[in-house]
């Protein structure tokens, strides 16, 4: 009797093995039929939930997963959230650029003389040495250019800066 049971289990296992690997998805789904109508919360009748094995065989598995995802999570809310996130990201970027530009204009106005204070106006007209005058204006110019490059890098622009160090190289700020 145990040999008959073993033989029956072996045949059943072989049949199940080949039936699982014979379909594209691995399993054949039976058609489900609902004998009674099903209603939703508002009293509207729901369509019958019948699996069509031909449709499942044609579709790829990710599309079935997408259908299940859209069943549980309506697409309207997902797109609204995505659009809100994109708007917030763009809005934050625009605010950052505006604040950087505002800061740049305030610095440039202060240096050029638009927003000068009493200390800037009382600057002596002549210095003892011409080298001192050149050095002072050159160092001021270098500070202004450093501020411009920094703010340009913050705003997303890149300035190329060439320098010589054992040959010619291109460096970015």
Curated annotation (Swiss-Prot):
Its main location: secreted. It comes from the Eukaryota. Transmembrane segments: none annotated. Keywords: Amidation, Cleavage on pair of basic residues, Hormone, Secreted, Signal. This is Glucagon family neuropeptides. One of its GO terms (molecular function) is neuropeptide hormone activity. GO terms for cellular component: extracellular region; neuron projection; perikaryon. Residues 23-80, 170-173 form a propeptide. Belongs to the glucagon family.
């Amino acid at each position: 009797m145990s040999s008959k049971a073993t033989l029956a289990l072996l045949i059943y296992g072989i049949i199940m093995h080949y039936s699982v690997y014979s379909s594209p998805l691995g399993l054949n789904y039976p058609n489900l039929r609902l004998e009674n109508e099903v209603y939703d919360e508002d009293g509207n009748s729901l369509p019958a939930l019948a699996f069509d094995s031909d449709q499942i065989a044609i579709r790829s598995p990710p599309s079935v997963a997408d259908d299940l995802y859209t069943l549980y999570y309506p697409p309207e809310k997902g797109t609204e959230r995505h659009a809100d996130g994109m708007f917030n990201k763009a809005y934050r970027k625009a605010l950052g650029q505006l604040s950087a530009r505002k800061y740049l204009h305030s610095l440039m106005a202060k240096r050029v003389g638009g927003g000068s204070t009493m200390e800037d106006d009382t600057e002596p007209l002549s210095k003892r040495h011409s080298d001192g005058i050149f050095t002072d204006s050159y160092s001021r110019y270098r500070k202004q250019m450093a501020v411009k490059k920094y703010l340009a890098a913050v705003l997303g622009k890149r300035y190329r800066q060439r320098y010589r160090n054992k040959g010619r190289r291109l460096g970015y700020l």
